[in-house]
Amino acid sequence: MVMEALREEGVDTVFGYPGGAALNIYDETYKQSYFRHVLTRHEQAAVHAADGYARASGKVGVAFVTSGPGFTNAVTGLATAYSDSIPLVLISGQVATSLIGTDAFQEIDAVGISRPCVKHNYLVRSIEELPRILKEAFYIARSGRPGPVHVDIPKDITAAVGDFDYPTEIKMPTYKPTYKGNAKQIKKALEVIAEAKRPLLYLGGGVVAANASELVRKFSAKTGIPAVETLMGLGVLAHEDKNLLSMVGMHGSYAANMAMSETDLIIALGVRFDDRVTGKLSEFAKHAKIIHVDIDPSSISKIVNAHFPIVGDLNFVLEEMLEKVAINEQNLTSWREILARYDALNPLDYKDSDEIIKPQWVVRETAKILKESGKDAVIATDVGQHQMWVAQFYPFDRPRQLITSGGLGTMGYGLPAAVGAKNAMPESTVVNFTGDGSILMNIQELMTATEIGKPVINIILNNNFLGMVRQWQTFFYGERYSSTDLSLQPDFAKIAEGFGGAGFVCRTKDEFRSALKEAMACGKTAVLDVRVDRFEDVLPMVPAGAAIYNMILKSKE
């Protein structure tokens, strides 16, 4: 029945790792031919790969794991997807119904554990309810505010035989997302937009999740309102869009953060006012009225009070707003001049060097070489300084181009997510930017990438540190580098070769250029160990608890 449900849902790829309680599912997987099963080397990686597949494709990602430690290994993947509203369905095996509650071998209360980090979960209690549950799981995962759904199936139920009657419609009276925005609220929002002197578009991952980027681009082009993007919203507007200031937040640009501080109207689309964006709440956008459009009513006024809340799907709401939106062009001209001065005062840049490789240079040079290749590129990251440098310096030009863990900040996410993205976008060049700390957390997935013949390029910005933690220690902990020095390291290039891939060590700019071009041409999963400046900082930086306009702009001497 699981196989038939996946066929009905159009699933073409599943990521997973087998075990005793999931053997019936895997036996049926062996017999079918309509989806590909990708055997990862760890259950956490299976869920991250399903997550990366979902982000890159816009489809629901699917993963299989077994009970007990198989499931607990998957929890970080669920929490990562939940934090970023990523649609996926995790199907876990469970001990037989008669053994539940007996502390049986590899028994764990999976639904109890998953409850805080999924949109919904199920413990299947009979074969008769399995088709309905699977239908609901996919519907819940992709509808409204997307998210992961967990389905736990005892082994006796996967062994049972029954009639497969897949529902043609969903009957969930207590779950009915609101898609069409309130007309009166939309009218009020349009009125305040017309009156605004310093309006600002605040764009987040919800725009990507709703596949509403084209409408946002039309809205931006029609109004000319300056815009900022969150980490999860990068690519909603193209990098070169004249209205886009850049990323906002803890490591956002000076101009973007000052715009958020001085705006008199925030038009918030698909965002949740995360602490990394707001900074000190009492100082956040003190002069601004807020229009907040989101399909999830629980996100509105949760952190920052919305003066004009609109619950609805961005596609429906923006279609209505586009017809009637008007702005005061004279006000906008003055506002743009103010923002241009901020950008000129502290542009997002870095001091390059001919003596040592700067990590920002690596990001920009990678973008340049990828563009010259003429192929589409998908960029994955792990979590740390490299993630922020990619966000700051990679010129994203479309949604779903950046695959990164935003809300949970999961180290070890990048490589398996890149494997998932490559399965979703096999014709695209997939590059994973990682650090010498993050890469070791799921490095076994080099084997997965090699086995399935879908190469991923991994660029390690190697500074012999847990770089972001080291940066905090530099600024806020008296330069006491407790447990962040990673000077003792493995040979990453040889590890890559041991997994059947290609390995490169890059100590100069020329070596990096040559290695990246060779990696793109060799047809193997590759690792580029790029030795970068050890003490380079990600700047600007808003200290924890500080106002968003209170930025550190220079490294400590």
Where are these regions (language model features)?
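Active-site diphosphate/adenylate-binding microenvironment
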Residues: V2-M3, R7-D12, Y17, I25-T29, ...
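N-terminal alpha/beta PP-like core and its mobile active-site loop of ThDP/TPP-dependent enzymes
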Residues: M1-I327, I369, P455-N458, F476-G478, ...
